[in-house]
């Protein structure tokens, strides 16, 4: 279930809330024209603009997410940047006064073509993805389900499901599981379990052999 959220400024605060179907926004969170799933938690001073966040996904604060689609059960660490702003390197000046013209009193309209390009290059992140502290996901990048992005990584290219990437620019380090196990987990689509199914089965997610035997034979 998604909730349409447009809360430019939120002042709620609780360091350890008990989550519910209603998205929880910590103090200073700003969510603009976005859709948040149930059991989601938006950290302190996080900004989310024109994005979709799936059920059970959370961030740890000071995160920036623009024009992105993020799946369910994702874990986003502190200070992550997803689809950060670009600058027009083909212009004489890269300064944003050339496209944020209203702010600098230069025009009555901003450069909508510039912003349209950014919207046309969304980041798409699968389910159960862990993004480490201060990682940056550049515009247009797709990250597969189950992937891990190491702390401080700058992701410039697509990441395969269940792949671990690290470094600047990010490069593959290893896969979390064998190809056959990855295929079977993907086919199980456990992230689509209903709430009653999750309450009944969540312990099985703690053991790969048990999970594979029951849900991904």
Kindly give the residue locations of the regions a language model identified.
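C-terminal segments of enzyme domains that contribute to small-molecule binding surfaces
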Residues: 1-10, 26, 95-137, 169-217
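Conserved catalytic-core motifs of eukaryotic protein kinase domains, centered on the activation segment
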Residues: 86-88, 159, 175-177
């Amino acid at each position: 279930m998604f909730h349409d959220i447009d809360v430019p400024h939120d002042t709620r605060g609780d360091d350890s809330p008990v989550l519910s179907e209603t998205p929880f926004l910590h103090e200073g969170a700003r969510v603009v024209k976005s859709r948040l799933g149930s059991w989601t938690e938006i950290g302190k001073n996080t900004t989310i603009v024109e994005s979709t966040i799936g059920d059970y996904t959370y961030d740890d604060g000071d995160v920036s997410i623009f024009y992105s689609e993020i799946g369910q059960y994702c874990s986003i660490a502190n200070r992550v940047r997803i689809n950060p702003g670009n600058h027009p390197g083909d212009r004489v000046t890269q300064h944003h006064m050339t496209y944020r013209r209203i702010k600098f009193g230069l025009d009555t309209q901003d450069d909508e073509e510039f912003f349209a390009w950014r919207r046309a290059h969304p980041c798409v992140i699968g389910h159960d993805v862990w993004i480490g502290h201060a990682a940056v996901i550049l515009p247009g990048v797709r990250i597969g389900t189950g992937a891990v992005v190491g702390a401080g990584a700058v992701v410039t290219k697509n990441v395969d499901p269940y792949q671990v990437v690290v470094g600047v620019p990010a490069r593959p380090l290893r896969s979390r599981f064998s190809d056959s196990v990855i295929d079977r987990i993907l086919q199980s689509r456990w992230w689509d379990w209903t709430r009653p199914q999750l309450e009944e089965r969540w312990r099985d997610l703690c053991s790969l052999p048990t999970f594979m035997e029951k849900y991904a034979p």
